[in-house]
């Protein structure tokens, strides 16, 4: 029989902070549904059900837009790895359990909506996309070497990456339904960043030196979204060249996040602050 995990000191210290932020998160939610952002009237069966299989001529959006959407989708597909790391670093009980479950559900909604839109509108090859999904999820995500504080810092940075990526992507999309969907995802990412960033803020009061060191470590190691998707090297370059998300955007968001924590003047963090 599996042993029930026991919360450690930091997990218990942050429990009331998680509760307060969870209450705020739910009180300010703006519920949305994947099916509202999928133009099902554009859909048709694939060959398996007597219709047509996908071919490149069916794509109508610019390549940079579909490349960015596929990167975003594959990242959302791999959220199970992030969920596992959060549970292993903290606990799936009480307010922690409620938050991690809620965060996972909201992130999964992004994957559901994106895949339904892209498959129904035939903007991407569903077979090729599925191959990459399986490959990337099997590769997994591991962060067992991160401390608990580093894990929270990473998540704050990661969610800010998602928000910037989606905002820049939405700004370049002319198709209104997809633009609206990406905007909704961006707004969720902003809320997720706020949650994790608030936990880091509390850590700065609770264990300041460790937290500053964690911020420096994660800032130094952070890469562009999708850098670990081996099959999408060309898509990553296209997205960077289009100004949606690349090294310049990454550097700026790291600087902005550190500044938002009030740490721009910290000696060990000055190298990450621009301007």
UniProtKB/Swiss-Prot annotation:
Residue numbers of N-acetylalanine PTMs: 2
Any one annotated GO CC term: cytosol
Keyword Nucleotidyltransferase assigned: no
GO molecular function term, any single one: stearoyl-[ACP] desaturase activity
Crosslinked positions (Isoglutamyl lysine isopeptide (Lys-Gln) (interchain with Q-Cter in protein Pup)): 145
Keyword Membrane set for record: no
Cofactor: Fe(2+)
Ligand binding (Fe cation 2): 107, 159, 189, 192
Sorted UniProt keywords: Acetylation, Fatty acid biosynthesis, Fatty acid metabolism, Iron, Isopeptide bond, Lipid biosynthesis, Lipid metabolism, Metal-binding, Oxidoreductase, Ubl conjugation
Pathway assigned in UniProt: Lipid metabolism; fatty acid metabolism
Origin: domain of life: Bacteria
Note accompanying the cofactor annotation: Binds 2 Fe(2+) ions per subunit.
Example GO BP: fatty acid biosynthetic process
Family per record: Belongs to the fatty acid desaturase type 2 family.
Leftover remarks: Was identified as a high-confidence drug target.
UniProt subunit comment: Homodimer.
Listed PANTHER family: ACYL- ACYL-CARRIER-PROTEIN DESATURASE-RELATED, STEAROYL-[ACYL-CARRIER-PROTEIN] 9-DESATURASE 7, CHLOROPLASTIC
Function recorded in the entry: May be a desaturase involved in mycobacterial fatty acid biosynthesis.
Protein name: Putative acyl-[acyl-carrier-protein] desaturase DesA2
Source species: Mycobacterium tuberculosis (strain ATCC 25618 / H37Rv)
